[in-house]
A protein has these predicted regions:
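Compositionally biased regions
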Residues: 5, 17, 35, 47, ...
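Exposed, polar/acidic Ser/Thr-rich sequence context and nearby capping/turn residues
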Residues: 1-11, 113-115, 124, 146, ...
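A short beta-strand-loop element at or near the start of a globular domain
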Residues: 6-53
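Aromatic- and Gly/Pro-enriched, solvent-exposed loop/edge beta-strand patches characteristic
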Residues: 57, 61-164
Length: 201
């Protein structure tokens, strides 16, 4: 399943290379994911990336959770980076197949000389069985502690820019001062949604 929402804007998603620390939480609706059959095994997730400069861009100490949800149509208002809510017990109880697929590993994007735009695959090392007609969530905490110099050379995610009041489909934050705890309550940002592909067998 390829969900290309748009290519009109680049953002620091799914990881920020220009700040020491950051998070991205992404919500994709059941309708958007409807092509994936019930019982499918999810093998990998890809993000559409633009990298002006070629080379390998590594980030250390990455923490990524994926899950579906039984009742949610958007993220709760008090979403934590790890996918839980600080206040919404129904949200917490209704998560499906909540799986941490990266727990401190190094992830890297290798950008070719050409083309600048590519899909970057992220393997799902743990078994993840799909439940049809349910939304899909990805929560990502970058605890690398360093940044990639340059304002335009590092990889950035492509997606659609949004305006006005939007559902809580994307949470985003970045800073240089300190690691974000996994229980940090996120900032909901209605201005962007990243493109993704989901592969299954």
């Amino acid at each position: 399943t390829t969900l290309s929402l748009g290519t009109d804007v680049k953002r620091d998603a799914p990881v920020s290379y220009f700040y020491d620390y950051g998070y991205n939480c992404m919500f994709y609706t059941a309708a958007e994911m409807s092509a994936i059959p019930n019982g499918a095994n999810i093998e990998k997730i890809s993000f559409e990336i633009e990298a002006v400069s070629s080379g390998t861009f590594n980030v250390l100490n990455q923490h990524v959770w994926i899950f579906q949800h039984n009742s949610g149509t958007e993220f709760p208002a008090n979403l934590q980076i790890n996918g839980d809510s600080s206040t919404d017990t129904t949200w917490n109880a209704d998560k499906i197949n909540y799986t941490k697929i990266y727990n401190g590993e190094t992830l890297g994007i290798t950008a070719p000389v050409s083309p600048d735009i590519m899909w970057h695959d992220m393997l799902v090392p743990s078994s993840f069985t799909w439940t049809a007609n349910k939304p899909f969530c990805i929560c990502w905490n970058n605890k690398d502690g360093d940044y990639q110099p340059g304002t335009s050379s590092y990889p950035r995610g492509l997606g659609i820019e949004l305006a006005g009041t939007q559902p809580r489909y994307w949470a985003f934050g970045r800073r240089d001062s300190a690691i974000y705890p996994d229980t940090f309550v996120t900032n909901m940002d209605g201005t962007f949604r990243p493109n993704i592909r989901v592969y299954w067998n």
